[in-house]
Amino acid sequence: NLSLRTMVITSATTLKDICEEFRNSTADLILIDENSVIAEPHLNVLTDYPRTASAALVAPQKNGNTFVRQYRVASASSESHKVSTGNRDFVGAMRLSQNQREPILNALTSASTRGAKGNALDLTLVALVRATVRVDAAEVWAAPYVRSSSEYERKLVKDQLAKINMNSVRLRMANRANDGFFSVFFLRKFSKILTWIAVRIGVTPNQITLISFAIGLYAAYQFALGDFWQILFGAILLQISIIVDCVDGELARYTRKFSKLGAWLDAVTDRVKE
């Protein structure tokens, strides 16, 4: 993403360095720990997804070093700060949003004067969270990762990633696993297949939205006819419309093609179908 800047965080990096790098740019800043090995689809969640706030890559972990509540980082750890009950691990990559420029600069400037010990990336996350700057939690799953000073551990994960089909990882990540029970275990099972077909034939997310809308309208027409079999056919069409409606978002996440028009079109057609 050409609108972003990237800064690799080493053991020598300080909070002041990060603050100055962010201050001297008008672009969002990606921070990556030199000891982190992260799959490209996971980094894409930070770099290519539309974001209005800062975000940090985290992975589910019982008693982890980070606490996430309602998809936002609520508490974080460093060498000088500990989380009492964590439910995620910070993977070692985050995005600082220029939409929060002043709060971020104030938080980092204030934190840098305290002289807390620890990795500058961890201290940055702690500083933002404690200053109540919004940091969205971007989940890492479907592929291994590591944040370790051990070269052996990093090489092990790199070798594992080299054997994985990243397109399959993108598809699994696009297929949301945090929806309701019926969506996860029924609708999304079928939508994933349709999404893969859409990728292969080159259909756009907006085209999928219109197809779902057309199926939904025809389902409504069948309901209006009032005959038992037509109502049954309409009910089947409505389920198909709902499944197809999952595909536009999955396709957008897979291809990383997001637009305000697409979001508006999806919202409007959903309301009409309802």
Q: What name fits each language-model region?
A:
Residues 233-274:
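Acidic (Asp/Glu-rich) catalytic motifs at the cytosolic membrane interface
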Residues 37-131:
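Conserved core of the sugar-phosphate nucleotidyltransferase
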